[in-house]
Regions:
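ATP/NTP phosphate-donor binding region
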Residues: 1-88, 335
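Predominant activation on well-ordered alpha-helical scaffold segments within soluble catalytic domains
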Residues: 23, 52, 75-78, 102-105, ...
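Glycine-rich phosphate/pyrophosphate-binding beta-alpha loops
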Residues: 143, 251-276
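Carboxylate- and glycine-rich phosphate/diphosphate-binding segment that chelates Mg2+/Mn2+
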Residues: 151-258
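Gly/Pro-rich interdomain helix-loop hinge
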Residues: 273-345
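Conserved small/polar residues in nucleotide/adenosyl-binding loops
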Residues: 360-369, 380
Length: 380
């Protein structure tokens, strides 16, 4: 697959070994002293060493980032950023590393706490937009799509809630999509992150918000997942499959400008309380949410089925594909296989009901006292 540059929604350099152009990216953004932000899992690979080898000067690395990052992770990163007088961030990793890196560049000179910039109304206008430092993103997973997003998700450890922090300038200025960086990803994380990409594209397509641009991107993203995720899972060295999955991941993040839904609003509280992998919980909830919403989404599911070339363009056949895909990826069938979902059922139901992405879930407010949410969370 040839190297190519895209300019939507930001500058994207796509292709094998494009990590070697990191110094050029820094120069284009006038970053002279970048802080590399990643997680400890990435440190166990040679990716950061390879990245530093491509820079004129060795960069300091901040890696105190949890798999479900917290506000404290951002605070510590901001401290490191300011103490060492950095002037930009290179965010490397999956969603945790990229979300944290973006937030560090955003928060470095803000005077308000991070929770004051939650994605509610015009709260983003509270920020000093002129003080946000430039960001370069290098994803090492194909799932979260944080590299093409204007938001980051963090757990507030005091309230055990996941919060979406948003600002238009949190969108990285340059994204390097190098499929070689996803080769070290183990099979289970390939599955989890790939299902996250599918959830983004699927929920975006099914959202009731009018956004035809995102609609088209979401549809093609679903097709790329169908044709490539199992290939990448079975053979992590399959560079073509890795390339297509990396593209679908970024496409999913672009698409969900149209909205998400109950898969994500259910996954957020589970991850906040039990620290589960976000993509895994999305994958577990997916068929239950689709079945629950069947009446309102069946026509769109038929359209998807036809586009991705399923043998029969029906809702039931699409569900069969989702279940088969989960089975091929060794995804647990029920939530009770990964958590004890009885202990915090009421709390999680309330959190899901009030999650900001639930507003595009077709039956979000249909049942009183969160009965619908309890029903989905209580699946055995």
């Amino acid at each position: 697959m040839e190297n190519i540059n895209w300019n939507y929604p930001t500058t994207i350099w796509f292709g094998v070994d494009r990590i070697k152009e990191i110094q050029k990216a820094c120069e284009e953004l006038n970053i002279q002293k970048p802080l590399i932000v990643t997680d400890n899992g990435i440190l166990k690979t040679n990716i950061i060493n390879k990245l530093n080898d491509c820079l004129d000067k060795q960069a300091i690395v901040f890696s105190d980032v949890k798999s479900n990052p917290t506000g404290k992770n951002v605070e510590d990163g901001v401290k490191a950023f300011n103490e060492n007088k950095h002037d930009g961030v290179i965010a490397v990793g999956g969603g945790s590393g990229m979300d944290t890196g973006k937030a560090i560049a955003f928060m470095a000179k803000q005077e308000r706490p991070i929770w004051d910039f939650e994605d509610i109304g015009d709260w983003w206008t509270r920020a000093n937009a002129d003080s946000i430092f430039p960001i370069i993103a290098l994803p090492t997973t194909a799932g979260t799509g944080s590299e093409t997003g204007r938001a980051s998700v963090f757990t507030n450890e005091k309230t055990q809630e996941k919060k979406i922090i948003f600002h238009p300038k949190m969108l990285p200025s340059i994204v390097i999509l190098d499929p070689n960086l996803t080769i070290p990803l183990p099979a289970n994380l390939t599955a989890f992150t790939g299902m996250d990409a599918l959830a983004h594209c699927l929920e975006a397509y099914l959202s009731n918000i009018f956004h035809p641009y995102s609609q088209g991107i979401a549809l093609e993203g679903i097709r790329l997942v169908k044709n490539n995720l199992v290939l990448a899972f079975n053979d992590g060295s399959n560079l073509e499959a890795r390339s297509h999955m990396l593209a679908s991941s970024s496409m999913g993040s672009i698409a969900f400008q149209k909205g998400l839904g109950a898969i994500h609003s259910l996954s957020h509280p589970v991850g906040a309380i039990y620290n589960t992998h976000h993509g895994l919980t999305n994958a577990v909830f997916m068929p239950y949410v689709l079945q629950y919403n069947k009446k309102g989404i069946e026509e769109k599911i038929v359209d998807i089925s036809r586009y991705i070339n399923l043998k029969s363009a029906t809702f039931n056949n699409f569900m069969d594909w989702i279940l088969e895909l989960r089975s091929n990826l060794n995804i647990p069938h029920t939530l009770s296989e990964i958590i004890d979902n009885d202990k915090n059922l009421e709390k999680m139901s309330s959190m899901a009901f009030n999650d900001p992405v639930s507003y595009t879930h077709l039956r979000a407010h249909e049942t009183p006292e969160h009965r619908g949410w309890r029903r989905l969370l209580g699946k055995k």
